[in-house]
């Protein structure tokens, strides 16, 4: 790809003095500021291929900002997994990050990241001009209520996705070993080696015996367990045109949620990928970018 080296890693310090790492492609005089939030357990660099394709599509019309969220990637902000009870901290971090960018922004994200993007869009409509959600973690109002009740009585401690994350292997002798270990397995079944390699480059640090995941299995599990189930009150406030793209296999966007969301108004538009999984941006990046392009042009 011709633009492959045009994304830089930068550091942003919040008002509490905590350092966050982020990726930026800043194009002078660009038409769009595209701000992207990654999924639970991942990091900004995971989506490098998607960003490269985005730059190839939009050229100097787009600037890209992708934050390593708290406890993820190469950010050094405080992340005590015993204190993580909701996704509010991710929303606060994202709001502050967006405020540091000049001009209005397009908010986007994958999975948890699209919920962070949606809540920020709801809270700051003057700053956010567009919202583009990819495979959101969104359940219907009744499903959400049930999950919140289960959380209150601590019944969701046995959440299988969180249990799986907590048991994830943390250390590897080398990046190559880690890529081999992940290729074709679990969540990474449909990913190419380049996607896996980018996930690991942006989400590991060197230790004496090789490398370790920078998003600890405990933090990842706590993030799953504290999943946001109060999203509907934010979504109802959103008045801008929104585009939601979602898959079918292992989708975190439930049928009940789809039925409820698209009844909120004609400003909620969508595209369904029947052959895609929850990892839609990894599987169909070009198509997702076409969706984004048509959404922004309309």
Task: Name what the model sees in each region.
Residues 131-171:
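Flexible "cap/lid" loop of the alpha/beta hydrolase fold
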Residues 166-225:
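Conserved alpha/beta-hydrolase catalytic His-Asp/Glu region
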Residues 63-108, 149, 290:
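Active-site loop/oxyanion-hole signature of alpha/beta-hydrolase fold enzymes
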């Amino acid at each position: 790809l011709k633009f492959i080296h045009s994304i830089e890693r930068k550091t942003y310090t919040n008002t509490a003095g905590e350092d966050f790492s982020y990726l930026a492609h800043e194009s002078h005089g660009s038409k769009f500021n595209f701000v992207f939030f990654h999924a639970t357990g991942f990091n900004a660099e995971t989506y490098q291929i998607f960003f490269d394709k985005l730059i190839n599509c939009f050229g100097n019309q787009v600037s890209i900002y992708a934050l390593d969220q708290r406890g993820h990637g190469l950010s050094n902000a405080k992340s005590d997994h015993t204190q993580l009870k909701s996704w509010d901290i991710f929303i606060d971090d994202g709001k502050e990050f967006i405020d540091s960018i000049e001009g209005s922004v397009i908010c986007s994200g994958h999975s948890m990241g699209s919920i962070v993007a949606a809540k920020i869009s709801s809270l700051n409509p003057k700053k956010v001009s567009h919202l583009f959600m990819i495979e959101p973690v969104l359940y219907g109002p009744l499903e959400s209520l049930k999950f919140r009740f289960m959380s209150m009585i601590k019944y969701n401690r046995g959440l299988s996705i969180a249990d799986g994350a907590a048991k994830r292997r943390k250390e590897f002798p080398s990046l190559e070993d880690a890529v081999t270990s992940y290729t074709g397995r679990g969540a990474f079944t449909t990913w190419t080696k380049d996607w896996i390699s980018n996930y690991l480059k942006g989400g590991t640090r060197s230790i004496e015996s090789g490398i370790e995941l920078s998003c600890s299995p405990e933090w990842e599990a706590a993030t799953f367990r504290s999943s946001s189930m109060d999203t509907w009150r934010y979504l109802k406030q959103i008045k801008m045109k929104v585009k939601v793209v979602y898959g079918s296999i292992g989708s975190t966007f439930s049928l009940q949620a789809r039925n409820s969301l698209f009844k909120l108004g004609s400003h909620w538009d969508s595209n369904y990928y029947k052959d895609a999984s929850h990892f839609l941006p990894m599987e169909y990046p070009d198509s997702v970018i076409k969706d984004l392009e048509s959404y922004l042009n309309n």
